[in-house]
Amino acid sequence: MGVEIKGLTVPALLIKLDPSKSLQENIDELKQKLSSAFFKGSYAVVDYNGLELNEESKVEIEKVLKDFNASVLGFQNTKNNKESLKGVTQKKSLKIINKTLRSGQKVEYDGDVLILGDVNPDAYVVSSGSVIVMGNLRGVVHAGANGDETAVVMALKLRPQQIRISNYIARSPDEPDVKAEESNSPEIAYIENNAIVIDKIK
């Protein structure tokens, strides 16, 4: 079968490892496929698909992607998902929403949330971890809902009605920043000095 790389939504990729091969064989094949300029500068979700991975193995995969200027958004295990979520040593699970959230829709999850689409006005996302939106964030997001002040909110375009991280709240300005609206740089919101700060990701 081999390593599969599929486009989830631009610029996110789903990298599905081959459990019938060793970790090193998967990494070698991944390097070969990532050599295409098409994948450089992408974000990726790695599905280890039943392959046994420890934290060192995940770091090794992240390093390979980093060498090709790609970033890992998270890991998932579709082949054994139920056991994965029950694992006591699991740091934080990742919920992937492969659609746009429309007005009135709400997602709540104990872990990190990756949305492969937009979050429209009056849509809500509540997460105990970080929230990553591979699209426009124009709704309401609460990251670190259980008090995690290290959580972040990332989006390709960050224009929320409200962002909340842990117990800190920020709202979009009444007058939009024209230069910011025209910018194509992804943005990240995080807590610094007891306030939510928004920066561009360069």
From Swiss-Prot:
Keyword DNA-binding: no
Keywords linked to the UniProt accession: Cell cycle, Cell division, Septation
Cell division in keyword set: yes
One biological process term in Gene Ontology: cell morphogenesis
Cross-referenced InterPro entries: CAP/MinC_C, MinC, MinC_C_sf, MinC_N, Septum_form_inhib_MinC_C
The protein's role, per its UniProt record: Cell division inhibitor that blocks the formation of polar Z ring septums. Rapidly oscillates between the poles of the cell to destabilize FtsZ filaments that have formed before they mature into polar Z rings. Prevents FtsZ polymerization.
Entries under PANTHER family matching the protein: SEPTUM SITE-DETERMINING PROTEIN MINC (PTHR34108:SF1)
Family the entry assigns: Belongs to the MinC family.
Complex and partners: Interacts with MinD and FtsZ.
Protein name as it appears in the record: Probable septum site-determining protein MinC
Gene: minC
